């Protein structure tokens, strides 16, 4: 579909908008005027005419698709394989559990601290499993979001969030 843009005076633009609305009877068009601007909208296009002191400006608005094509994308009618559902359920049950890391890890992106080392004696809480997002299975490198609270000298308690693999932590008593 090709769309052209024409530059015209504000009076001509308003009369052309009403003529376009009358000429295309099969496409419902709506014309509204508010605060020195006229808007012509249809199911196929949306044009906004703005009047200024020197000239009229014609802007083309894009429409957003509300439904995806049924031949592509995620089909909600088909069910996922049972082993994926069991794995998802098993991983979602871990959310809220207290965990410890198995070996020391360095965390670099902590505000106002150069680096923090997580040791096996520190306890964190799993906040989220990110392997299932917006109805689709994804394969993140570090699927578990774990929150730690550490005491830093001269700053008090600092909350930091770390993404970990399942092999990097062990679950302790809930």
From Swiss-Prot:
InterPro entries in the cross-refs: Elect_transpt_acc-like_dom_sf, Fd_thioredoxin_Rdtase_alpha, FTRV
One BP term from GO: photosynthesis
Alphabetized Pfam families for the sequence: FeThRed_A
GO cellular component: chloroplast
Keywords carried by this UniProt record: Chloroplast, Oxidoreductase, Phosphoprotein, Plastid, Transit peptide
Keyword Phosphoprotein attached: yes
GO MF annotation list: oxidoreductase activity
Phosphoserine PTM sites in chain numbering: 70-71
Organelle targeting peptide span: 1-62
Superkingdom as given in the UniProt entry: Eukaryota
Biased composition (Low complexity): 69-81
Primary residence: plastid
Disordered: region residues: 69-89
Location(s) in or outside the cell: Plastid, Chloroplast
Protein function: Variable subunit of the ferredoxin-thioredoxin reductase (FTR), which catalyzes the two-electron reduction of thioredoxins by the electrons provided by reduced ferredoxin.
Family: Belongs to the ferredoxin thioredoxin reductase alpha subunit family.
Subunit structure of this chain's protein: Heterodimer of subunit A (variable subunit) and subunit B (catalytic subunit). Heterodimeric FTR forms a complex with ferredoxin and thioredoxin.
Protein name: Ferredoxin-thioredoxin reductase, variable chain, chloroplastic
UniProt source species: Spinacia oleracea (Spinach)
């Amino acid at each position: 579909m090709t769309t052209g843009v024409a530059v015209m005076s504000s009076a001509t633009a308003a009369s052309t908008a009403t003529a376009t609305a009358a000429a295309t009877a099969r496409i419902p068009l709506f014309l509204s005027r508010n605060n020195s601007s006229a808007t012509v909208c249809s199911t196929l296009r949306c044009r906004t005419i703005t009047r200024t002191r020197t000239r009229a400006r014609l802007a083309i608005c894009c429409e957003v698709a509300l439904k995806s094509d049924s031949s592509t994308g995620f089909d909600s009618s088909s069910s996922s394989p049972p082993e994926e559902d069991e794995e998802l359920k098993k991983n979602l049950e871990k959310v809220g559990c207290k965990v410890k890391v198995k070996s020391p890890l360095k965390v670099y992106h902590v505000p106002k601290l150069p680096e923090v080392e997580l040791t096996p004696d520190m306890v964190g809480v799993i906040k989220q499993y990110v392997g299932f997002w917006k109805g689709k299975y994804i394969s993140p490198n570090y699927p578990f979001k774990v929150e730690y609270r550490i005491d830093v000298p001269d700053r008090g308690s600092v909350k930091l969030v770390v993404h970990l693999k399942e092999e990097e932590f062990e679950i302790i008593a809930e």
